[in-house]
Amino acid sequence: QVLGELDQFPTLDGSFSLHSSLFCEAFHNSAGALNEARAKFVRPAEVQRFKPDHTLRVLDVCFGLGYNSAALWDSLSGQTSRMQWWGLEIDTRPLRLALADTGFINHWTHSTFNRLRSLDQCSEWTDADGQGTLFWGDARQCLDNIPEEQSFDLIFHDAFSPQRCPQLWSE
């Protein structure tokens, strides 16, 4: 149990989040995991600035329940952009808990759900719009699995707070 005990709780936007006993902190604020993903990650990403034929390269550090990437994927639904996606996560339980929750599943398009399910089952997804790989383990070591020359258009860094998890906030 890498993140300690995980307690599930509802948030005000109808999504759910988890509280980690190890870090004594919730994954999301009580206003809503889905709202937080859209406000802190998807909107600031300004994906419309990329040309339609551009392959979007994304790194999601501390993938957790998957809200941030799933919200991004849904925001791109129907666009011509392709994606190369990498995720890093230390604990398999958050994604499994998310995929066991009907409310969580109902937030997403069919293609986004398929990506999440594929990440849970085989740590990667491939579809007509791109491909993705999720590396399980400590993000600091998992970065070595990504080619050194790889650059990213977007990096989602969603670790616990620097006070609770300073190892993922060092320079």
Segments and roles (model prediction):
Residues 1-56, 73-105, 130:
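Rossmann-like AdoMet
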Residues 47-51, 115-121, 165:
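Short C-terminal domain-edge/linker segments immediately following a structured domain
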Residues 54-55, 112, 153:
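S-adenosylmethionine-dependent methyltransferases
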Residues 59:
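Short beta-strand immediately N-terminal to the catalytic nucleophile in serine-hydrolase-like folds
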Residues 62:
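Conserved glycine-centered beta->alpha loop in an early N-terminal alpha/beta scaffold
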Residues 65-70:
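Glycine-rich SAM-binding Motif I of class I
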Residues 97-146:
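S-adenosyl-L-methionine
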Residues 131-171:
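Active-site segment flanking the S-adenosylmethionine/decSAM binding pocket
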